[in-house]
């Protein structure tokens, strides 16, 4: 299985918001069937491959948190240039997520060629899939252009990892213009995620503590050790971030943290740090508060550092620039 641990992939670049020319009805006249087509394709794909929702949400974060929502993550590497897609942290991005974007783009190009950007497709698909698995409706606007650059060297240092300290994680969020409250809400996406064993093996196979970390439920730790016993020989071995309702977008992730079911080191940190604990408690008790905060934070992320006008293009193929010569 591919890793779907969302791991707080956070932007370090300028926090300014560029919302120029974005609107909810951007394609009403130029491609009126866009949203209907998108919803039908994501519905069919999610039914056929239930991990599509979490995979696409992860793809959204890995795109938008590195220089904005500009579909740079979709560009394939060439002999001359290694793209973001092949950065170390992106190599486990799920094929189903790329596939659903390609399917939507192909269908939309047949109806209205050279109109709808790949970045708008990714944002729209993520919104629809979150709702499909029980999550809140995220208000999104359209009008983004696709990036003219995708460079793997721009990724490192902009995406946080699960073994980082809370100080480090918070500083990354703050550098991107996101508050601690928004950070805690966005991490709730772990409610439908799962992670490779290698991402939490150091917690459960600690030689100094045979029963697992003291903050982890001992029975949970024991089950994880069984599941991941062969992880060094099978890199695809994974565990759900939310062991109780892994396919449903709800507030169970936060409830789990309060009872020792946090999978990643960053999960434990966010549950007990003085700066974040009260928010974890709030979202564990009040799912409506979590949904509202998550939707607003997602909307903010989706509109950060948007490319418009000559800063981008509408790609004919999401994995290639329009001037690609081979």
From Swiss-Prot:
Residues modified by glycosylation: 21, 163, 206, 230, 274
Required co-factors: heme b; Ca(2+)
Amino acids binding Ca(2+) 2: 191, 242, 245, 250
Record: active site: 62 (proton acceptor)
Assigned protein family: Belongs to the peroxidase family. Classical plant (class III) peroxidase subfamily.
Signal peptide: 1-20
Subcellular location: Secreted
GO biological process, one term: hydrogen peroxide catabolic process
Molecular function per GO: heme binding; lactoperoxidase activity; metal ion binding
Gene: PER6
Domain of life: Eukaryota
Pfam families: peroxidase
InterPro entries linked to this entry: Haem_peroxidase, Haem_peroxidase_sf, Peroxidase_pln, Peroxidases_AS, Peroxidases_heam-ligand_BS, Secretory_peroxidase
Reactions that this protein is recorded to catalyse: 2 a phenolic donor + H2O2 = 2 a phenolic radical donor + 2 H2O
Disulfide pairings: 31-112, 64-69, 118-318, 197-228
Cofactor-binding details, from the entry: Binds 1 heme b (iron(II)-protoporphyrin IX) group per subunit.
One CC-aspect GO term: extracellular region
Record's keyword terms, sorted: Calcium, Disulfide bond, Glycoprotein, Heme, Hydrogen peroxide, Iron, Metal-binding, Oxidoreductase, Peroxidase, Secreted, Signal
Functional description taken from the UniProt entry: Removal of H(2)O(2), oxidation of toxic reductants, biosynthesis and degradation of lignin, suberization, auxin catabolism, response to environmental stresses such as wounding, pathogen attack and oxidative stress. These functions might be dependent on each isozyme/isoform in each plant tissue.
Site (Transition state stabilizer): 58
Protein name in UniProt: Peroxidase 6
Misc note: There are 73 peroxidase genes in A.thaliana.
E.C. designation(s): 1.11.1.7
Residue sites binding Ca(2+) 1 per the record: 63, 66, 68, 70, 72
Chain positions recorded as heme b binding sites: 190
């Amino acid at each position: 299985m591919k890793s779907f641990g969302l791991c707080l992939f956070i932007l370090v670049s300028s926090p300014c918001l560029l919302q120029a020319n974005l609107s909810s009805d951007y394609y009403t006249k130029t491609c009126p069937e866009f949203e209907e087509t998108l919803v039908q394709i994501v519905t069919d794909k999610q039914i056929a491959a239930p991990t599509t929702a979490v995979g696409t949400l992860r793809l959204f974060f890995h795109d938008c948190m590195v220089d904005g929502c500009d579909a740079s993550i979709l560009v394939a590497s060439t002999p001359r240039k290694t793209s973001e897609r092949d950065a170390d942290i992106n190599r486990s991005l799920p094929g189903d997520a790329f596939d659903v974007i390609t399917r939507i783009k192909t269908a939309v190009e047949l109806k209205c060629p050279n109109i709808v950007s790949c970045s708008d497709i990714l944002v729209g698909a993520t919104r629809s899939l979150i709702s499909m698995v029980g999550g809140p409706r995220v208000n999104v606007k359209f009008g983004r252009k696709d990036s003219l650059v995708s460079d793997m060297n721009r990724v490192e240092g902009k995406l946080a990892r699960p073994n980082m300290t809370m100080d480090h994680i918070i500083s990354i969020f703050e550098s991107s213009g996101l508050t601690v409250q928004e950070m805690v809400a966005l991490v709730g996406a772990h409610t439908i995620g799962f992670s490779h064993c290698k991402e939490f093996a150091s917690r459960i196979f600690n030689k100094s503590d045979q029963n697992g970390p003291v903050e982890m439920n001992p029975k949970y730790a024991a089950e994880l050790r069984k599941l991941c016993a062969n992880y060094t020989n099978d890199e695809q071995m994974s565990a759900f971030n939310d062991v109780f309702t892994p396919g449903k977008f709800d507030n169970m992730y936060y409830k789990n943290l309060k009872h020792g079911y946090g999978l990643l080191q960053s999960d434990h940190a966010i549950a007990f740090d003085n700066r974040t604990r009260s928010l974890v408690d709030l979202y564990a008790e009040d799912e409506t508060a979590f949904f509202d905060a998550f939707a607003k934070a997602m909307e903010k992320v989706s509109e950060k550092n948007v490319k418009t006008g000559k800063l981008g293009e509408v790609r004919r193929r999401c994995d290639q620039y329009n001037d690609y010569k081979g």
